[in-house]
Amino acid sequence: MANETPAMPSPAAPESKPAVPAAAPSGTAAAPVPKPAAAVPAAPPPEPKPNPLPHVDLPFQGVDYTLRGVHAEATVAPADVVGAAEKLDREGFALDTITGVDWIAAGQMEVVYDFFHFQKTLRVAVRTRIPRENPELPSIHQVYPGANWHERETHDFFGIKFLGHPDLSPFLLPEDATYHPLRKDFTS
């Protein structure tokens, strides 16, 4: 028949590969199994960074700026935050931010003050911890007037009371808010 088209060959089925390599025929050696690479010894801890402010009477420790966002950190007692702010003010530092951290498992709140110095290109943090049940510490608004709204915001979100602050009325939350949304036990 002249008008018939030849049948198309059916496509070849893809070869299936066994999931597990076949065992070597008896009498032949199996291919060697590669050994895992030797464990690389852990790098030694980084050298501590020098204190960039050795002349300032605060317990600063130099830290890695790329990891922490500051060049040095100091932890002080709550009663010493105003004194720390005064020392940094005398050195020409400006206040950048104030924030809180809720360490619920430890029953503590932390307040972190970030300062910067334009001429020295330095950023430092001062930290303090207070009991979570009654979180109070002195206000630094007398030293840094711009701390006024930072402290109000931290009070709004964490419930931390800054003693001596002229007005801790809600800053960002509704006026009738009785909650602090950044505390870890907050539920909406």
Name each region found by the language model.
Residues 1-188:
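Terminal low-complexity/charged segments
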